[in-house]
């Protein structure tokens, strides 16, 4: 969802989703579990009543660091590995671990069009720098990297093959995949995937594609910066 404040309304690009009906339980259940684990001792425990209905069309994945559970990372990898035609990713911070990187490259090698949309300049300059070493490997394998212009794209979304989508709080970086409390909804819905693809296509009109030629021509000073800042990746 959106951050709240004037800068986020005018200078950030985010994606919001509204859930109604039976699927609300997916988020409600996560809130109940989180509240009951971290609630103040003076506050009441919320009842855990179980699902009111079962549906595979909308499900939620929650990272729970206190239990060492990180299903969102597996959800991303599984969806990418299933792709046969296209993968469209939007993320604010893109620092994939080796398994996520390998799944993206494997998809591109089998003919899947993989497009990754990230901000050209995010609000975390260190995250921008430690992400850069991955660009060359991805570009050489045919993965498209698009740089969003004039605003901070903060969405965390992915669609696969026009049938599966996720919208949530998790970036593709170490903190989101292996550290933070995060929640992502996954949708098995062609209409929603089609809408997400329309939004992605519109976002590309405000982005520029990073080419392998441009990447290979970056300056020596830039390359030195990448090497020097690379060891700081575990911090972001």
Predicted regions and their residues:
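Charged, low-complexity intrinsically disordered terminal segments
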Residues: 1-236
